[in-house]
Amino acid sequence: MKNQIKYLVLIILLLNVSGQANATLKLKEIRTASSDVLVVVFTSEIVLPTTNYTTWINTKIDVNEVKTGDVSGWKLNGIQPLEINKFVTESSATNSGPKRAEHRIFLKVPLLINGTVYKLETPHGDTTFVFTNRTMFCESIKTNQTAYSGLSDARFANFAIWLGTGGSQQIKGKLPEYNVYDITSGRIVSKGALEDIGKDFSSGDYVYRIDLSGVPEGGPYKISVFGYGCSRPFGVGGDFSTRLGYVSFRSMYYQRCGIPLKKPYAWEDIRENHCHTLLYDVNAPTGEANLVVVGTEPSFTVYGGYHDAGDADRRLYHLIRVPPVLMTTYEAFPEYFTDNQFNIPDKFDENFNILGKGNGIPDIIDEAEWATLIWEYLQDPDGSVHWGTETKGYPEPFAIPMDHDYKKYGTIRIDNEATGMAAGVFMHLARLLKPYKPERSVELQQRAEKAMAYVGNNVNNQQKLYFAVQKYLLTGDIVAHQQVKDLTSLFANSEINNPGSSNYSNNILAIFFYPYLIEKERPTDQVVVQKMKDILRNTADREITIFNSFAYPVGNPITTKRQWGNNVNQGQHAYPCLLEWGLTKEQKYIDVVSQLMDYNQGLNPIGKCYVTGLGFDQVKNPHDRESEYTKSRGWGVKPGILVYGPGNLPDRIEFTILPEIRTLPRERQWVDHLFTYGMNEFTIHETLIYPAVIYPVLAEGRIWDGTKDPFDVVEHSIISEIKVDEQDKIEIYPNPVKNNITIASTENDEILNLKLLDSMGKVVFQVDKINLATINLNMNSYPNGIYILRIESRSGATFKKMIKIE
């Protein structure tokens, strides 16, 4: 999906700078970090004569490529900065392309003045810009760049100054005021002053809070902090949330295995044919990328399931976490999920060729059925189920559609855990499909019974509970109901003595019993119901306590053992709160859900949207083979991929970052580098599934048409930000003007310099060293509209507003 953002941002740069020390170094943007810190952003790349991986990975970015050693080479309006700091981070894809990096140079300068034109001199060229509170991006303002939830009564942005090698900084003196304004009209919708939150250990930031709870649903908005600059655009609820829910849910579709990815369901014709449908019955032991297929083993055709991540494995973890979350979410919020909601194919022939969509079944159930389908193929006649599928190594070639992968895939061994989990999933899906596909429901119920009969007492208690709940709700079986009662009592006692002990493979226990809580047709035991309610509420309340212990909504305890993706797994932490809100409608629970889900949309120390295709500071290099293919075609990356994010350091550091990454706090330990698997890979079960179901609930089930970008607006003029001098030391006439305008000093004062700015503050014409009392300016080549003249005479600078007409 191509994010066509047309809002106009004031970045007035001379991109073709002269005198570059390195031909690959480009001046990209001017920002602020504070009222007296300017951020000059450069990008660089190294084009290698070879695509050899070893050569490529060992080629290092020069952190001193931007020349900061001599302060005299930098000037702002002729004044040298008092101090220079830097942050350098690599941003590379694969060894078939260049090594890339971003250099952010922090210049300590005099206090910036609203409406002032500045000339910046650097060792790599000069540029001119205008600083205004509403148009200069301040990177210290951290917001959800996509959609704050309209369901929440609490929302916020954070403000934190971080200067790379200069570290975290506090604001000196009185805390600044801010306002929130609609960027299309300029209307202020909320205002206040920054609130001191204090030092945050997890991020290393000294944090200030910007209250957004009074901002109404709508947008796009920006936050303007007086003297500092403005935030990136953001929206609240409405189309903003709807688009976020749509993109997030469809991330599951883009990871499907055994299906083409083509228009009109994909944004381009990515994968023309089915992939990975030929499976060899190897029955190999579990192991990472270590399954050898000879090619003489018995083979069969399969469909369904998902590619695990940047590879094409289909693993037990998908079965444990994906179908139960999809189906439980639907049962908790059936009003928010419908058919034709997410533009996914749901009509197929017997060989799973796509016939269309609109089968009358909610899309979320269709997705659960696709997630379950592969496990039906992996079930043997005796009821047992394989652990998954695997190959030797990873899909090859690298940047390809998955239907071009030439590797052979085989089955992994029969597994009791897979069989026990499949029993519950098959029974759950049988129950949900019964009103729509009764014959299919019967088949799934039979599969469930065979799986449970095979695994017997080798199933764990969570799987027993899941199966028993679903069997009782589907059939009314008395024995199954008694199992529900007995197991719930067992778990309730365990939770009293050891909170959280009943969780299973990152699934909270409530996923397995929640349908029993809300059952309306079968009789339920109210003692059991209360025990279930207590377990769920206690789980949700623990997450609220953790949420409140950090300045950013990271939700992940400091004590958590490092694992891939644990600092972007806000969905896992939010999910029990979501279920509790679904049950009780207590506002505090949906407030915490909403705020936790702001983190990976940009409300984090780096200000990065960790989800591809969303936000304004996006992930460019997810470790995803098909995304590298779509990038090579000029289509951008597959949207909706939530990468693993910060805090998961590899044993070997093979990328460039300054300050050194081990010295950074956990929430800043991230590099946008495709080969940092622990940071830029992802999985269907760890990072994608929870956003896929939570964001549509936060959007209240609204349907997005897939084309209307709510950020596709024209920004309000900056003219209101520039103080226009109405005194008559300088005259301009005629005004309005058709052809030529005269600028004259009424006091015979020499005009020294002249700048013509358009309505967005861009310098469209400039002339220096005039030294005349009168000058004529030809306006014939300029389009109609409002302009600002900045006229500098010996008496000082004057701003004049003028109108160009036909």
Regions found by a protein language model. Give the residues of each.
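Edge beta-strands of extracellular beta-sandwich domains
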Residues: 125-133, 230-237, 798-803
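C-terminal outer-membrane/trafficking sorting elements
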Residues: 184, 723-806
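Acidic, glycine-anchored loop motifs typical of Ca2+
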Residues: 343-364, 736
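Aromatic (Trp/Tyr) and acidic
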Residues: 25-80, 91-105, 146-147, 153-227, ...
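Residue-level detector of functionally pivotal "anchor" positions at catalytic/ligand-binding pockets or at interdomain
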Residues: 134, 705-733, 747-748
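Low-complexity, Pro/Ser/Thr- and charge-rich linker/hinge segments at domain boundaries
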Residues: 132-154, 231-269
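Surface-exposed, short loops/turns at beta-strand junctions within beta-sandwich domains
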Residues: 108-115, 213-219, 780-784
